[in-house]
Amino acid sequence: MNVTHKSQSRAPQPQPGAKKRILVVDDHPIVRQGLALLINREPDLVVCGEAEEATGAMHVLASAHPDVLIVDISLNGPDGLDLLKTIRTTHPVLPVLILSMHDESIYAERALRAGANGYIMKQEATEKVLVAVRRILSGEIYVSDRIANKMLKHYITGSGTLRNSSIADLSDRELEVFRLIGEGHGTRQIAEDLHLSIKTVESYQAHIKEKLSLRSSRELMQRAIQWNMNEKTA
């Protein structure tokens, strides 16, 4: 468990003009380092701690007392949405910004419904993260333009996930397995990607087929590929 923090165990008393404290949670050290370099250059912001997975993040959260969290959606073990839901049980109003590699709007919808205050793509983090952090610290919701446009288009056309009840019925982990199937990943590769056992992945696949009324693994793959294509071109 790799965690770092820069705080005392007692919550710091806010001072006039004090820098806003940010906890970065990402399983890639280079991403954490890059965000820290970017954030620590700002006169009003400072990274107070880092973690690479959910358990470590909760430990640092308890000791570092951040003003905002930046969380990667695709953490090893419990993912970013699982961590977000856990955080909301103890810190219902703490601002959380989700970083994601997924540009499918369903992930943004689920993150916001789970209590996220913002959602941006990792590839635009350098450009958008400072704006996003300041927006959510001011009480706003921030979603990157690309994702916002997709969500609006889905809402207007009625093709969005809110009206696609079968896909919407999938759990967060089932959706992740479904997406990886659509990208051509086999069961063993999915298990490795998500740090799950093959038996667990097979169980998720069975649940997905049941929820989507699919009779075979072939139908599951075809449906997943089609869904991925639709989301990418939306």
Name the predicted role of every residue range.
Residues 53-56, 79-82:
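Acidic catalytic/metal-coordinating carboxylates
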Residues 72, 100:
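Active-site residues of response regulator receiver
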Residues 31, 76:
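The feature encodes the CheY-like receiver
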Residues 16-18, 152-180, 231-234:
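Regulatory hinge/linker segments at domain boundaries
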